[in-house]
């Protein structure tokens, strides 16, 4: 199998789990006398998982420990603008408080990893893409909730126009046969082995994925490899194509070999979208919900883990509430048992009806076999018995009706007496009473009558007001954690490395797996002496063997050492962290001081010349 083709030319989801870019006790981000913003670059991570998790952790530490942090500037860079458009769509969905948290999470999972979508998500996309177009075009009428946290200044006019075209292509009126495009990709990768693809999918799982991610179940992985559907919610029918996964890449024509742009599905067909949110958990208690025997046996699958993580993040960031997983599971069990009971009762009713029908049919057959005289005698006897029973039943019904009418009359009389007493108490006015006193007494009577009738309604409204929240505001974490998102598209060398604005600018840089090739000597210009470098690894990618994974790690460490970086002890299995050597730090500081001195001398000379 061609590895590069199977990974995809345009990646729509991450290949590593989420991480916190700042530790909770990190001195870099703590608020001090220096309140300059911390600048973070996230390049080609393919989604917002690192951003969401860092904001979640900072918000939790602010609430629990009371720590204050410096403002943060997140520069989210993607080579392909289609991925940036998806990021904007996910931000809109996360901040959409008209939807419940569970609805938001389910729609996010479906748009994130499914090639086919249900009708409700398609309707939502058809509404939101118009709002996103108006936001990108800076229409004054469109004032979304997230307008103050997203900055488009790093995008060119040409990129904004192309993003507008991408959003307009989300409309369901434009055809996009994603099943055909994806099947062509699979057929091209497997070639002669396409007819035996299920066996190959099984091989990839057992030889690669099962070793590092056993919670990804075999049947779900094979179902995704074959159909492109990773997350199945309830009883939805997945029929409509996910147009957010459409993109263009450069290709060549068969005749003449002229270059052209080819539209299709150019994403991942091997690794699966379970890796980003469906593997890692924070605490041992959470691990006990999904695993047993120290992560050897699993109780649930990766879809449950992704749903748990997303609901936990959004519930805490929006409502500042902890997610009680076991309580929700008990409610699910209760609802499931009720549904089972209902189904059993319905089956019993159907069986009884069928038995009654059979008995009637048998009786009719027997009647036909009996002689006519006997049938007439039996019919007369049945009529007599029926007439007696009907008479007795009618008499009982009459007695019951009379009793009910008597009770209703008594109740009405009692109500009328009480109302008359209230009117007499409230409305009777003395000769010496003023008009103001009259109005006061009348108002008391009216208020008492209204309050007695609407006590339940007022309680319901009060409960609703406690549950509802302002839909025109950001979620709580986005309001309290000070940050801003800058979207950057296109080549990183042209849009970041070569710009003077970003010289010695970034404090933290995270490179996705596909951005490793963009790391070169030009990258040193944007670094500070204390910059931390983070690199995503291919530890959880099924398209690589164990040897190639080790070689990739070794080559990455060598490359960073040659450029003056040292591997940090806080590195993870799926992510390496590097720091600049102390010698290089001193050299960089000297260079910065010399540059500052030169700039000051130039400024002083300019001022002297202007004064002269």
Name every feature range the model reports, one short phrase each.
Residues 405-407:
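Periodic short-repeat tracts
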Residues 593-594:
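Intrinsically disordered, low-complexity proline-rich tandem-repeat tracts
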């Amino acid at each position: 199998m061609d590895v590069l083709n199977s990974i995809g030319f345009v990646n729509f989801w991450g290949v590593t789990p989420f991480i916190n870019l700042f530790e909770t006790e990190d001195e870099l981000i703590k608020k001090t006398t220096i309140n300059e913003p911390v600048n973070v670059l996230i390049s080609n991570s393919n989604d917002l998982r690192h951003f969401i998790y860092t904001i979640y952790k900072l918000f939790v530490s602010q609430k629990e420990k009371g720590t204050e942090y410096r403002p943060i500037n997140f520069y989210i860079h993607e080579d392909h603008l289609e991925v940036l458009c998806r990021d904007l769509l996910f931000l809109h969905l996360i901040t959409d408080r008209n939807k419940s948290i569970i609805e938001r999470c389910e729609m996010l999972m479906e748009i994130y990893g499914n090639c086919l979508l249900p009708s409700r998500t398609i309707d939502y996309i058809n509404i939101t893409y118009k709002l996103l177009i108006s936001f990108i075009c800076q229409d004054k009428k469109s004032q979304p909730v997230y307008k103050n946290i997203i900055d488009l200044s790093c995008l060119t006019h040409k990129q904004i126009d192309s993003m507008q075209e991408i959003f307009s292509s989300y409309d369901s009126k434009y055809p996009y046969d994603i099943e055909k495009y994806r099947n062509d990709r699979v057929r091209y990768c497997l070639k002669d082995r396409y007819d035996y693809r299920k066996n190959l999918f099984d091989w990839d799982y057992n030889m690669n994925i099962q070793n590092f991610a056993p919670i990804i179940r075999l049947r779900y992985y094979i179902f995704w490899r074959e159909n492109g559907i990773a997350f199945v919610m309830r009883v939805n029918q997945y029929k409509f194509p996910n147009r957010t996964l459409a993109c263009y890449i450069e290709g060549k024509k068969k005749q003449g070999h002229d270059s052209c742009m080819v539209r299709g599905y150019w994403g991942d067909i091997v690794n699966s979208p379970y890796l980003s949110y469906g593997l890692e958990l924070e605490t041992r208690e959470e691990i006990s919900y999904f695993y047993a025997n120290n992560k050897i046996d699993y109780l649930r699958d990766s879809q449950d883990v992704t749903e748990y993580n997303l609901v936990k993040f959004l519930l805490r960031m929006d409502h500042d509430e902890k997610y009680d997983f076991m309580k929700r599971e008990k409610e699910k069990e209760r609802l499931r048992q009720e549904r089972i009971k209902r189904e059993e009762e319905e089956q019993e009713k159907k069986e009884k009806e069928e038995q009654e029908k059979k008995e009637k049919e048998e009786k009719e057959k027997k009647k036909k076999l009996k002689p006519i005289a006997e049938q007439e005698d039996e019919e007369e006897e049945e009529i007599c018995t029926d007439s007696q029973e009907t008479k007795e039943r009618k008499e009982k019904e009459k007695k019951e009706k009379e009793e009910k009418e008597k009770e209703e009359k008594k109740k009405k009389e009692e109500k009328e007496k009480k109302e008359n007493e209230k009117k007499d108490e409230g409305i009777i006015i003395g000769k010496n009473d003023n008009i103001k006193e009259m109005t006061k007494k009348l108002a008391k009577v009216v208020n008492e009558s209204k309050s007695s009738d609407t006590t339940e309604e007022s309680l319901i409204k009060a409960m609703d007001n406690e549950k509802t929240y302002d839909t025109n505001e950001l979620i709580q974490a986005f309001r309290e954690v000070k940050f801003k998102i800058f979207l950057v598209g296109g080549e990183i060398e042209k849009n970041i490395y070569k710009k003077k604005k970003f010289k010695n600018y970034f404090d933290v840089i995270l490179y996705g797996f596909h951005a490793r090739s963009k790391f070169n000597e030009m990258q040193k210009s944007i670094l500070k002496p204390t910059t931390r470098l983070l690199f995503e690894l291919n530890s959880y990618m099924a398209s690589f063997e164990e040897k190639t994974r080790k070689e990739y790690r070794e080559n990455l460490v060598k490359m960073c050492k040659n450029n003056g970086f040292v591997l940090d002890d806080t590195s993870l299995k799926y992510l390496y962290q590097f720091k600049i050597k102390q010698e290089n730090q001193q050299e960089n500081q000297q260079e910065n001081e010399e540059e500052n001195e030169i700039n000051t001398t130039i400024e002083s000379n300019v001022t002297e010349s202007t004064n002269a």
